[in-house]
């Protein structure tokens, strides 16, 4: 768990170091309302949003709401998603009939249910 958190923090720092501020009404790549959004498919509301990328069947996207959002991935019919509300977010996984929401409200969340999809 500690190694996972450390890896996520490194990813967040790399994103902060490389993200490009985008403030535009262009909705194809970035939806912007007074925030910093990654120029590739980023969303954010008062926070930092990670970009959406596609890799041959693997789709990733991210959301940030006043915190750091980590990517969600669609893998073989299973869907996982990460959201952050004032903190670091863990996966919101939907797959094989199992819903596992992991949401943060100004703190770090622990898993609420098993996540089916591999991350």
Curated annotation (Swiss-Prot):
Disulfide bonds: none annotated. Its main location: secreted. GO terms for molecular function: structural molecule activity. Sequence repeats lie at residues 41-45, 46-50, 51-55, 56-60, 61-65, 66-70, 86-90. It comes from the Eukaryota. Keywords: Extracellular matrix, Repeat, Secreted, Signal. Pfam families: Lamprin (PF06403). The keyword Chaperone does not apply. Self-aggregating protein that is part of the soluble form of lamprin. The polymeric lamprin chains self-aggregate to form fibers and have secondary structures particularly rich in beta-sheets and in beta-turns. This is Lamprin 1.8-10.
